[in-house]
């Protein structure tokens, strides 16, 4: 099986696993993973955070977004553009639309744009992940192109335990993350003393 075929299989299995969670499991899991993220020093210290609006059964960070906003943190959301580009947009109160792939997305003309090097923390969704912080995304490479430019940010994947695989199918274009947060634990591929 090729890497592309392995990624497709892991993507399909990971999406099915997260969709299979009951409403009760999903509610408890979302609360637990948001609490884990908010307990990390990298969250506490972050001023500018890129997160995402949950789609297709992804881990929901709404509770984290509410608390982060209450703390005065700046919250940006990804906008997918031409050429598989990604922009971190801070939407105004009336600055939302349903964008590419049916995802709730900021309207760029009604948003402040943050450069990648302004971000302190990037929370990345995935379809599958492994314990050494590799991820399988949706297959377009938006985050893989964007993350190398986030030079000062801690980059954390967010997923449910059910999405973990023994070894994520990755190639030279896939960006390894600094860590992963799930409802059940934390996975880090480096020294965690700074987190």
PLM regions and their residue ranges:
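Glycine-rich, N-terminal phosphate-binding loop of Rossmann-like dinucleotide-binding domains
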Residues: 53, 126, 184
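Surface-exposed, charge/polar-rich loops and edge strands
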Residues: 1-5, 16-23, 107-108, 117-122, ...
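N-terminal active-site beta-alpha-beta segment that forms phosphate/nucleotide-binding
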Residues: 2-118
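Short glycine-rich anion-binding loops that position phosphate/pyrophosphate groups of nucleotides
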Residues: 55-57, 127-131
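A short beta-strand-loop-alpha-helix capping motif that often carries His-Thr
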Residues: 83-85, 120-126, 139
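Charged helix-capping and loop-helix junction motifs
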Residues: 66, 138-142
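A residue-level signal for conserved active-site and pocket-lining positions in enzyme catalytic cores
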Residues: 14, 51, 75, 123, ...
